[in-house]
Amino acid sequence: MSKKLASPLSFLPLYNLLSAVGWSYLLYLVISLYPKVGQPAFFYQTKNVATLVQCGAIIEIINSFLGVVRSPLLTTVAQVSSRLLVVLGIFQLLPNTSGVQSVVYISLLLAWSITEIVRYLYYFFMLVFKNGAPKILILLRYNLFWILYPTGVASELRIIYCALNAAESQYSLLYKRILIAAMLAYIPGFPMLFLHMVAQRKKVMKSLRSSFGKKLI
């Protein structure tokens, strides 16, 4: 039974495509603007764009809650909220901390943007095209995470850690403790997500090898 294809202009494919465009723009800024202005000027010129693009992921929580997608709600909330904490809780509320003004901000944007460009384009192709995503996109989706996931998480943790003292002095001890609790949540959260991707990769690579073998016969 063939899968039901969606129109490119229907909500879910369009959301994925626009999200890919948004992250592509951020990657373009890293490549084109950062070498010209450096840090911390680059952070101040791009933090609002990064916040806006990342906040678009709130729609993923809504989609999961309504059953529009099959992603588990708790997993989606955990993934999105950790990033929202960074863009809203640090970029917007604590913009003068050392983490976001350093090269760590660049490594964060590179890890986030490349990951999301590939992910959203993968979803778009899977929804719209009969043959699904191009093989190169599948390979990128299930191999880049080896480098990009640890890089992104390490960058997030560094940015949060550098904001701890400012969180207490500018807001309250409670806010500092919230940030610490968020950091501790990465201990079970990251291995769980990473191992899930490893398991998914194993299935996908096996399927690709099987498909490639059939074409040779």
Swiss-Prot record:
Its EC number is 4.2.1.134. Changing residue 116 to A: Exhibits a moderate fatty acid elongation defect. It comes from the Eukaryota. A motif (Endoplasmic reticulum retention signal) lies at residues 214-217. GO terms for molecular function: 3-hydroxyacyl-CoA dehydratase activity; enoyl-CoA hydratase activity; very-long-chain (3R)-3-hydroxyacyl-CoA dehydratase activity. Residues 30-47, 95-99, 161-178 are lumenal. Catalyzes the third of the four reactions of the long-chain fatty acids elongation cycle. This endoplasmic reticulum-bound enzymatic process, allows the addition of two carbons to the chain of long- and very long-chain fatty acids/VLCFAs per cycle. This enzyme catalyzes the dehydration of the 3-hydroxyacyl-CoA intermediate into trans-2,3-enoyl-CoA, within each cycle of fatty acid elongation. Thereby, it participates in the production of VLCFAs of different chain lengths that are involved in multiple biological processes as precursors of membrane lipids and lipid mediators. This is Very-long-chain (3R)-3-hydroxyacyl-CoA dehydratase PHS1.
